[in-house]
Design a protein with these regions (language model features):
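Surface-exposed acidic, glycine-flexible loop patches that form ligand/cofactor-binding
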Residues: 1-2, 32-35, 150-158
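A short, charged/proline- and glycine-enriched loop
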Residues: 2-7, 231
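Patatin-like phospholipase
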Residues: 6-10, 15-118, 122-132, 136-139, ...
Length: 242
């Protein structure tokens, strides 16, 4: 019987385009009377933007859809500005470095040119090694997610039903890393008492969605601060992976 079955909805990724496409999915399910019976939503990347916003505003579908479409337009614009500034900064930096090298070639000996080249390589290595902190693109986008979509909501603000799992990838273990109302993490971060090392109560939804939509090299990884930890690494089964 239908009542004995659970309904799961998977929303895939693809940035803001995927989020826009999934509006059609939810609209169709709502018209069929199925959306209200969905028990579990699993999402990634652009699908997580829509899934998280829907979970917070599911009580009135029409208001949810209108509100999301309005905010989606703002989100696309804001992200375009952020990316534009980042690209411009990179172009200007490279132009400066190239100009420096060409200048050195024009007036210096081979040794001087070699020094200039080594400085150039050193700067590249420095930027790559410190990209977590000096290129906080993910932090900027997360702030925009929060401003446009989530208004400082935390994972604990999600409803009990449908159960929402926002999925990301843990670069330390190469495993699926999930965010939900009552849990953060994966098996490698389970304490000996069977609970997660991380506290989901006050963890920002915007950060969870950013982690889910964090395309490698396009964004910097999202880290989880000490204030969201409930235990010590020495009591974690797989603490060496953290």
């Amino acid at each position: 019987m239908m009542n004995d079955k659970r309904i799961g909805l998977a929303l895939s990724g693809g940035g803001y385009r995927a989020a826009a496409y999934h509006i059609g999915t939810l609209r169709a399910l709502n018209k069929l009377g199925v959306l209200k019976d969905v028990d579990v939503i699993s999402s990634v990347s652009g699908g997580s933007i829509l899934a998280a916003y829907y979970a917070l505003h599911k009580e009135n579908y029409n208001e949810f859809e209108k509100g999301f479409i309005d905010r989606l337009q703002k989100g696309v614009l804001n992200s375009s500005i952020i990316y534009g500034i980042a690209v411009l900064a990179i172009i200007l930096s490279l132009a400066t470095l190239i100009s420096f090298i060409l200048y050195q070639i024009g007036i210096c000996s081979g040794i001087c040119v070699g020094v200039g080249f080594m400085v150039f390589i050193g700067l590249i290595v420095f930027v790559v090694s410190k990209s977590f902190t000096i290129l906080p693109i993910s932090k900027l986008v997360s702030e925009q997610y929060d401003k446009v979509f989530f208004s400082q909501a935390a994972l604990s603000d999600f409803p009990e039903e449908p159960m929402l799992s926002i999925n990301a990838t843990n670069i330390a273990t190469q495993q699926i890393f999930s965010f939900s109302k009552n849990s953060i993490g994966e098996y490698a971060y389970m304490l000996l008492n069977g609970k997660s090392l991380f506290d989901a109560t006050h963890f920002p939804i915007a950060d969870a969605v950013m982690a889910s939509s964090c395309v490698p090299y396009g964004f910097t990884p999202v880290t989880i601060g000490e204030k969201f930890r409930k235990g010590k690494l020495s009591y974690c089964r797989y603490g060496s992976f953290i």
